[in-house]
Amino acid sequence: MDTGLKDGRLAPCPNRPNCVVSQGGDKRHHIDPIAYEGEKSAAVELIQQVVQGLAGIRIAAQTEDYLHVEFRSKMMGFVDDVEFFFPDSAVIHMRSASRVGYSDFGANRKRLEKIRVMFQQRWTRDGKA
């Protein structure tokens, strides 16, 4: 399990397709960060609310600029590590990786894209944009 910040960056993905990351990474593993305009503290709070509304989660670690969430699959009980990094710029960097196996059939990417959409909809709806 390679989680946490190292020199202000999320860990790169291993050479398996079951991981995506917004900082660095090759094309296969890249996902865009979430951009927002507004207060960082409000973005941190909203990401927390969004992920807490999803099934099978456990907050594993949290600081003022980092959130590590474990997602447990319903059927097999596999754990995926999902991380959010809130640097001082108005972006949220993300990483999602399966702990075991090779392919995830795009599950990690789909999860982060779902979180992105939910965040952006609520950010706009709540008048933070």
Predicted regions and their residues:
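Ser/Thr-rich, low-complexity intrinsically disordered terminal regions
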Residues: 1-129
